[in-house]
Amino acid sequence: MAEKEHYVRTKPHVNIGTIGHVDHGKTTLTAAITTVLAKKGLAQAEDYSQIDAAPEEKERGITINTAHVEYETEKRHYAHMDAPGHADYIKNMITGAAQMDGAILVVAATDGPMPQTREHILLARQVGVNSIVVFLNKCDLVDDPELIDLVEMEVRDLLSEYGYPGDDVPVVRGSALKALEGDEEAQKKIEELMDVVDEYIPTPERETDKPFLMPVEDVFTITGRGTVASGRIDRGTVKVGDSVEIVGLVEKVLTSVVTGLEMFHKTLDLGEAGDNVGVLLRGVDRDQIVRGQVLAAPGSIKTHKTFKGQVYILSKDEGGRHTPFFSDYRPQFYFHTTDITGEIELPEGTEMVMPGDNTEFSVTLIKPAAIEVGTKFTIREGGRTVGAGQVTEIDD
């Protein structure tokens, strides 16, 4: 195997992503950011088709898979995730949104906030994305500046509605396509956006002192070397030689030793919270580990089947259910990176839960999940998100 380039950590690292309604220009903006930063030698310019390249979407022209792009500003190193915009593929938004320290919300000035704008803001809030910066795109297509003011007000109100500081959120107006085409004014706006991202989205306090935990997103085999699990480190640190446990979905916990570590296809000495890494595991067969399990410091997390959760159930207008549900309702609970069916039991005195309600209830899962108090989840049925919440109590 060829010797890999070594990843050197010099600037603080931040995970961000683009969110917003389909066709509002998320991927075009991602391409524009890399193109503008490439002129300063801080990125490799990625064109739209490179970022948009996921096999399933070719026939349909909708972003399905999550693209990771890396670039730098003068101050920081960024991993940028392009979140899918289409409601059918909200599942990737959920695995993706969990990977963001902050987000750039893209809203087309020609349209204003649309249903998925709202859904992405809600999901960002529920999966703990605490800082959002707004890019009003396609401003070159709106003649009347008062109309753009109106769209900006609507976006600020919407952010406030979901608990973001709508009045203080920075809003940058521009045109991603114009910037991509080389328009100087438009490129200045992209620079302004990145300055705002540098300043407004705080460098995350990495949870490096907590025990290591990494939800497994993907598993593959390197011939002659063994099995690799990849994902974003949730907390703690990991290095070659560490013992780890593979926890979740089955009762039995498997123990292994880390024999290799990579980030951005470069070898890494130490992986820390927030890093997207590949972990090479000793003595683990490809079929002994699956997406949805976690790698964890030995003894730090256990599997559970029953818990209480504080949950927000989406209203009909947010794309949620149209009808209430009762005890014994059996949707899917999306933990870390996988769906597990669970049966809901409503608390005494609550006969039913209406779309739009905030509530707490008990859940019994059909498979054990690696969860603890504070673990976030979404509730899904038939491929759509109907609720989101977090674990408030473990009951088994």
Curated annotation (Swiss-Prot):
Mg(2+) binds at residue 27. Residues 175-177 are annotated as: G5. It comes from the Bacteria. Residues 11-205 form the tr-type G domain. It catalyses: GTP + H2O = GDP + phosphate + H(+). One of its GO terms (cellular component) is cytosol. It is found in: Cytoplasm. Signal peptide: none annotated. Belongs to the TRAFAC class translation factor GTPase superfamily. Classic translation factor GTPase family. EF-Tu/EF-1A subfamily. Residues 82-85 are annotated as: G3. This is Elongation factor Tu. The keyword Transport does not apply. Residues 137-140 are annotated as: G4. Its EC number is 3.6.5.3. Residues 20-27 are annotated as: G1. Keywords: Cytoplasm, Elongation factor, GTP-binding, Hydrolase, Magnesium, Metal-binding, Nucleotide-binding, Protein biosynthesis. Monomer. Gene3D superfamilies: P-loop containing nucleotide triphosphate hydrolases, Translation factors. GTP binds at residues 20-27, 82-86, 137-140. GO terms for molecular function: GTP binding; GTPase activity; translation elongation factor activity. GTP hydrolase that promotes the GTP-dependent binding of aminoacyl-tRNA to the A-site of ribosomes during protein biosynthesis. Residues 61-65 are annotated as: G2.
